[in-house]
């Protein structure tokens, strides 16, 4: 049978392929670089596994990299191929304030139970709880947040995977989130 491949085939050396391997136990996590990083209840550790290059317009108002300014410069796998992947580790009761992205964001619970909340079409907040390997995918522009709601040990971290589209995606905290952070003294003023 004659068959002509339609897609370009690429061969990759082992050395080059190993640059695309990230070992979880070797990843560097960061707990800062976002407007709400130090706000009580929002503490979390973010791991930049694939991509997340610093976006244009970073640190202008509430616009930032989804993983914060430090982590966005230290991807374990440094590629820009249309998507980004990271992990969040957090204790129960912890997660970011409401924010949105300029591209899709998909969450996959790896361990524990995670609550994914969003603002619905009537301006009210709704949520679903995700157990391990459950997935939710938010369209661009939808205000959302996530929180570890695992029952049991309050000192036991759980892990959430997130995948965000684009090459240098942007996150922006909502006006209400920024006002709360400012009112409580968590934003730098110039």
Regions found by a protein language model. Give the residues of each.
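Short acidic-glycine-tyrosine-enriched beta hairpin
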Residues: 120-140
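His/acidic/aromatic-lined binding-pocket segments of jelly-roll/cupin-type domains
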Residues: 87-88, 98-99, 104-109, 128, ...
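Short histidine-centered beta-strand/loop micro-motifs
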Residues: 73-78, 96-101, 118, 126-129, ...
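Histidine-centered metal-chelating micro-motifs
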Residues: 94-97, 115, 134-136, 140-147
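Glycine- and acidic-residue-biased ligand/ion/polar-headgroup-sensing regions
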Residues: 92, 103-115, 119-121
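Conserved short histidine dyad/triad with adjacent acidic residue
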Residues: 65-73, 84-101, 140
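A short, N-terminal "cap"/entry segment at the start of jelly-roll beta-barrel domains
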Residues: 1-81, 189-190
């Amino acid at each position: 049978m004659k068959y002509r491949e339609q897609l370009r085939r690429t061969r990759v050396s082992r050395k080059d392929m190993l640059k695309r391997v990230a070992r979880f136990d070797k990843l560097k996590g960061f707990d800062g670089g976002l407007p709400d990083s130090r706000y009580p209840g929002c503490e979390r550790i973010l791991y930049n596994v694939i991509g997340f290059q610093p976006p244009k317009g970073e640190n202008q108002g509430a616009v930032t990299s989804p993983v914060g300014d430090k982590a966005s410069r230290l991807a374990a796998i440094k590629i820009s191929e249309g998507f980004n992947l990271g992990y969040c580790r957090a204790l129960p009761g912890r997660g970011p304030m409401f924010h949105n992205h300029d591209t899709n964001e998909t969450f996959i619970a790896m361990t524990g139970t995670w609550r994914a909340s969003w603002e619905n079409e009537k301006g009210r907040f709704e949520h679903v709880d995700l157990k391990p390997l459950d997935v939710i995918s938010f369209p661009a522009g939808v205000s959302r947040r996530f929180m570890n709601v695992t029952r049991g040990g309050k000192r036991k971290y759980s892990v959430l995977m997130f995948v965000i589209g684009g090459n240098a995606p942007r996150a922006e905290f909502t006006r209400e989130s920024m006002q709360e952070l400012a009112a409580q003294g968590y934003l730098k003023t110039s």
